[in-house]
Each structure stands twice: as structure tokens, then as C-alpha cells.
């Protein structure tokens, strides 16, 4: 676990997301992301906290103990403490795979299984809370790694 990972997302990724949202004149309602090493979600969380934003940080985790969503939910907290999440959204492996496949068909963008999980979790959050602002997630892996699964 590289602490510079957190710093990069706190000082580069999160400010860029925030700037893009400010330009739309909407609020940043939530950031939805799985945790591998935890650098992305922890860096974004720190930025949100430091800037007193009302943005909810939502952690995506596999629903099963023995899952196939590579890159997230391996049981180690690394750089992100799950207690810092406002909400935990559990996604089944088969649903993450289905979402990644359907996203590729709809957009032509081939993403991996953890990106499918992030997308589905963000959609479920929107359905559950109907936020007035923007819900952000990231597509953090490439689909060509999973061609045998697709």
C-alpha cells in the first residue's frame, strides 16, 4: 500500500471531479467506489472531508465471501477504513459481470468486473436515494483482462 496513492487522489483526482461538477452547477451527492488498496476512495474521502463537502462516500464490496470481483474486497482494509464509508453497497459477482458486459454493449467501452460493480452500485444508490446532485464512480479496470469470463 503506497501512501502516495492516497495523496495523488486527494490532490489531483478529487479536485478535478469537484471542478467538473461545480461547472455543472449541481452538487456532488456521492462518490461510489470499491476498495482494492484503498488509495482512490481514501484520497477522495480526505478531499471531501477537508473541503467540508456534504458528499457521501459509499464503499462497494462483493456480496459473497468467495467472489470473483478481482481488485476489490479481498478482506484487507489497506489505506481505507470501511468505518469511514457513509454506506456500504454489496454487489454479487454475477451482477457485476452482467453490468460490465451490458455497459460494453451499450457504450463500446470494455471495462472489468470491478468497474461493473462500481457502475451497478452507483445505479442502485441513485435508485434508492434519488439524489438531487451528481453521483460519481470510476471505471478503474480494463475488460480485456476478463475476456475468458465474458
Question: Predicted regions: what is each one?
Answer:
Residues 1-35, 95-109:
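Active-site/ligand-binding-proximal alpha/beta "capping" segment
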Residues 27-34, 55-63, 134-140:
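Beta-strand segments within the central parallel beta-sheet cores of soluble alpha/beta enzyme folds
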Residues 46-113, 128, 149-150:
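Active-site/ligand-binding loops adjacent to catalytic centers
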Residues 1-3, 111-113, 119-134:
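Structural signature of the thiamine diphosphate
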Residues 34-45, 114-122:
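Short glycine/serine/threonine-rich phosphate/pyrophosphate-binding segments
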Residues 1-4, 35-39, 61-66, 92-93, ...:
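Glycine-rich beta-alpha junction loops
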Residues 78, 123-150:
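Phosphate-binding loop/pocket of nucleotide- and phosphate-handling active sites
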Amino acid at each position: 500500500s503506497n501512501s502516495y496513492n492516497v495523496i495523488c487522489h486527494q490532490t489531483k483526482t478529487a479536485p478535478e471531479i469537484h471542478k467538473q461538477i461545480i461547472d455543472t452547477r449541481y452538487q456532488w451527492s456521492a462518490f461510489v467506489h470499491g476498495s482494492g488498496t484503498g488509495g482512490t476512495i481514501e484520497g477522495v474521502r480526505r478531499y471531501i472531508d477537508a473541503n467540508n463537502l456534504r458528499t457521501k462516500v459509499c464503499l462497494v464490496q462483493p456480496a459473497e465471501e468467495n467472489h470473483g470481483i478481482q481488485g476489490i474486497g479481498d478482506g484487507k482494509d489497506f489505506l481505507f477504513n470501511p468505518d469511514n464509508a457513509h454506506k456500504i453497497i454489496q454487489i454479487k459477482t454475477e451482477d457485476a459481470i452482467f453490468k460490465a458486459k451490458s455497459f460494453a454493449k451499450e457504450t463500446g467501452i470494455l471495462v472489468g468486473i470491478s468497474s461493473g460493480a462500481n457502475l451497478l452500485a452507483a445505479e442502485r444508490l441513485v435508485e434508492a436515494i434519488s439524489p438531487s446532485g451528481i453521483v460519481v464512480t470510476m471505471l478503474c479496470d480494463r475488460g480485456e483482462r476478463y475476456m475468458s469470463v465474458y
